[in-house]
Regions:
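Short cationic amphipathic helices and targeting signals
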Residues: 11-13, 68-71, 140-146
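Surface-exposed, low-hydrophobicity interaction/linker segments
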Residues: 25-58, 62-132
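Short, flexible turn/loop "capping" segments at secondary-structure junctions
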Residues: 5, 62-63, 134-137
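Short beta-strand scaffold segments in enzyme catalytic cores
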Residues: 11, 132-135
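Short Lys/Arg-enriched alpha/beta "domain-start" segment
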Residues: 1-41
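Loop-centered beta-sheet repeat module
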Residues: 135-161
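Primarily extracytoplasmic ectodomains and periplasmic/lumenal surface modules that are beta-strand-rich
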Residues: 20-21, 77-79, 150-152
């Protein structure tokens, strides 16, 4: 995690409103789901600042010295492009042989690609990434370990839900 060691880039925000008393409960209600449920659509959820698999959000795991350390985890299953291309080529060749064709139409190529993804995506390990944060509730300050506008927008959207 960037806040633990080494250099890092962060964005700092003032929290304009008073934070609710049950803040940790609100984060726990939106915790990251189990990795078995991850598909090819990105899934967002909160984890503690310890690691991307720690979904037990409580005072012992997320609070230190009055500050909250949490990470917004994104999980998605992706099929490597080289593997997907190889599987598609294999299926296209089998289709041409079975139907005695010289080529495969673009419509059929699209269908073969979709079927290949559907068939193999759950065999792929989920790719995990995280955007760490430190929240100082008494100072009403939020430090987010991200610098790109898209990451910050994604983070703030989830933070204010």
């Amino acid at each position: 995690m960037p806040f633990d060691r080494g250099s890092f880039t962060f964005a700092m925000f003032d929290i304009p409103a008073e934070l609710p008393e049950n803040l940790l409960d609100l984060f726990a209600a939106k915790k990251a789901g189990p990795l078995d449920a991850v598909t090819d659509e990105p899934q967002l959820g909160w984890v503690t600042g310890h690691h991307l698999l720690d979904t037990t959000i409580n005072e012992e795991s997320a609070q230190m010295g009055g500050s909250y350390y949490l990470t917004l985890r994104q999980a998605v299953r992706k099929m490597p492009a080289s593997l997907l291309n190889a599987v598609c080529k294999r299926e296209e060749q089998a289709y041409m042989r079975a139907n005695e064709l010289e080529y495969v139409s673009s419509k059929m190529k699209k269908q073969i690609r979709e079927e290949a993804i559907e068939k193999h995506i759950q065999k792929m390990p989920p790719a995990l990434s995280g955007i760490p944060m430190v929240l100082e509730p008494h100072e009403r300050l939020l430090y987010v370990g991200a610098s790109s506008r898209s990451q910050i927008d994604l983070f703030l959207d989830m933070f204010y839900q």
